[in-house]
Amino acid sequence: MNSVSPLATQYGSPKGSQQMENRSTQSGGHEQRKMGHQDATLDGEADEVDKLKSKLLSAWNNVKYGWSVKMKTTFSRSAPVYLLGERYFFRLDDEIERFQKDFVSRVWLTYRRDFPALEGTALTTDCGWGCMIRSGQMLLAQGLLLHLLSREWTWSEALYRHFVEMEPIRSSSPPSMPLSSLATGHSAGDYQPHTQCSGAPHGDQVHRNIMRWFSDHPGSPFGLHQLVTLGSIFGKKAGDWYGPSIVAHIIKKAIETSSEVPELSVYVSQDCTVYKADIEQLFAGDVPHAETSRGAGKAVIILVPVRLGGETFNPVYKHCLKEFLRMPSCLGIIGGKPKHSLYFIGYQDNYLLYLDPHYCQPYIDTSKNDFPLESFHCNSPRKISITRMDPSCTFAFYAKNSEDFGKLCDHLMKVLHSPRAEEKYPIFSISEGQAQEYAEGPQSSSHPPVCRKKGPLVKRPSSDEFEFL
């Protein structure tokens, strides 16, 4: 009798063939699941390593910068303090309280941790690389507050926050010294008390909405996720260093692609020149690009990237810089000391007041109606000598309409060509015409032009060299 093997029997009948196929499929599926499980395990381990690195970096960062949040800042009683166009005399007790309320009301955006991972990465924190983006966010937030509310608006909770105690230096001047001697260029007769808004419910709601727009979530129009995505247009990605000029162009793109503020446009100057006709087009809504022509830009944020020296800050620009910060239309300056971005909002004597984005805070879920606002406001003013400022920076101004822009240009021309200015050539120029046509894109915009000034050539470090690491 002929013997028949089981294998032959299986292949000799459709039923046997099907059973073999099922076993093979089950075996292959098992191997695939095993390999998939191993890959998932490796991915999970890599994610855990990245999270651990982020936590260690955040912890070290807060050890390095956290102590400065609680430090006392010394202010002089004999010199006025300027904060984004507002002037305060610390010889007057009520002025100190007004300054505190004004300062705390400025939006403070810092490193965050444990937010949803940035697209295409495992990064859940910007600690160590996102400081210039945060400075740009603070500048834009100030522009939105000015656009949607007013410069007089203050946060209703500002005075209820614990304000870090300052140590004003006692003035050696006699107590009877008139106010006219406390501020250069101002007399006691033209001094007017500051008018502060009482923090109406409408203002507080607008303020809360603005904070939502900057949330570290993919759906936020001005959040870190969106700005990093827009940065790819200019050759930047998450984890890269961003300079003040690149961030200016990212802010412009963020406003162009958003629907939250259709009556606001952003202009970035070319070759350190502000072209008035181009800005007038924005006021009229006559913009050749469809994405910027929505809703007739009735207000404009003007960003002017500049370089104030070679490898270090040139002190001849000190006068103009301080004069800009005295202007009510000034939105501040993004820049910083070398490899360390800061947002400058005022000055006293030869020291700049700033907000520091380097303190790392936990992610805040702004989808909740009553999300906490405290971490978006700083209660400790900091100062830095003007001479320590990095020469690469971006100035920002706001004009609500064409008439306002005309006044701004007149003021800027007086400052730029002031007899008190030590620099023969102005920081930037204002032209009546239009900029020549140029192709927008990564190649032309990722490396914005630097100012062309007469004089010997100086080796200049990259404007993107801003970070503390």
Swiss-Prot record:
UniProt keyword Zinc, yes or no: no
GO cellular component entries: cytoplasm
Spans annotated as Disordered: 1-41, 169-191, 436-469
EC number in record: 3.4.22.-
Ranges annotated as biased composition (Low complexity): 171-182
Gene Ontology MF terms in the entry: cysteine-type endopeptidase activity; cysteine-type peptidase activity; protein-phosphatidylethanolamide deconjugating activity
Broad EC category: hydrolase
The entry's keywords: Autophagy, Cytoplasm, Hydrolase, Protease, Protein transport, Thiol protease, Transport, Ubl conjugation pathway
Segments of skewed composition (Polar residues): 1-29
Keyword Protein transport: yes
Subcellular location: Cytoplasm
Function as written in the Swiss-Prot or TrEMBL entry: Cysteine protease that plays a key role in autophagy by mediating both proteolytic activation and delipidation of ATG8 family proteins. The protease activity is required for proteolytic activation of ATG8 family proteins to reveal a C-terminal glycine. Exposure of the glycine at the C-terminus is essential for ATG8 proteins conjugation to phosphatidylethanolamine (PE) and insertion to membranes, which is necessary for autophagy. In addition to the protease activity, also mediates delipidation of ATG8 family proteins.
Family of this protein: Belongs to the peptidase C54 family.
Protein's recorded name: Cysteine protease ATG4D
Organism this protein belongs to: Xenopus laevis (African clawed frog)
